[in-house]
């Protein structure tokens, strides 16, 4: 598939009928690139864009040709959070009062955060610029974060006279950087630059702008070499570990996941075979099959 064939807006795909506010590319085999595409507003979280993103995520989780998803923003920003100058109508709120309309708007944003977490595929956030307010929340909902040198992060609710706690930020940020740093970042409303973000574990890597997507594609390509069930269950276990009430309960769920793969596939035996048979590993996520991985 050529680059021209592989790159298209969602609206051009008959089974993904949404707007060009979200652009879908397939830049590498088994890798999907989702780009927030309102660069003039630094990809702010207006409801029309978020509705489109939700629709894309809903579709792509069942696209079995995609093993890893990369999420980024067009232009100079990743996502600038709430847009105080541009608003879009709240969908499906006819006849509701203004307070209920506001609740529905927040529900839509919350559903996007949860959709990223629940996506079958791992999600890598390629943070190409500022991730502010809800944009920081969006980045934290990804499984892996890579930042360009021009990226920075801000829990902006506190700067806007509101609470810094929004869209799961007070849950996700302490788990990413620790409670003390999360308290300080959220209560101060200061900017966290890309270098500091890498130092405190907010992002895995800080790279130059021109290397950002290639770095993410390299990570994605490695992830895609492993079994689909192993990757999906590892993602579930990691998020489940953040929610776990105790080590004991979480170890039980991990053990069940390992047994599920061991009993229903030949992956474990296949992983050892190439050492003696001198051939590439072929993980098929099934027992007794000789087909290629899927």
Curated annotation (Swiss-Prot):
Gene name in the database record: echA12
GO biological process, one term: fatty acid beta-oxidation
Reaction catalyzed: a (3S)-3-hydroxyacyl-CoA = a (2E)-enoyl-CoA + H2O; a 4-saturated-(3S)-3-hydroxyacyl-CoA = a (3E)-enoyl-CoA + H2O
Job of this protein: Could possibly oxidize fatty acids using specific components.
UniProt entry keywords in alphabetical sequence: Fatty acid metabolism, Lipid metabolism, Lyase
Originating organism: Mycobacterium leprae (strain TN)
Matching Gene3D superfamilies: 2-enoyl-CoA Hydratase, Chain A, domain 1 (3.90.226.10), Lyase 2-enoyl-coa Hydratase, Chain A, domain 2 (1.10.12.10)
A Pfam family per the record: ECH_1
InterPro entries (alphabetical): ClpP/crotonase-like_dom_sf, Enoyl-CoA_hyd/isom_CS, Enoyl-CoA_hydra/iso, Enoyl-CoA_hydra_C
Membrane recorded as keyword: no
Family: Belongs to the enoyl-CoA hydratase/isomerase family.
Protein name per its UniProtKB record: Probable enoyl-CoA hydratase echA12
Gene Ontology terms, MF aspect: enoyl-CoA hydratase activity
The keyword Zinc is assigned to this record: no
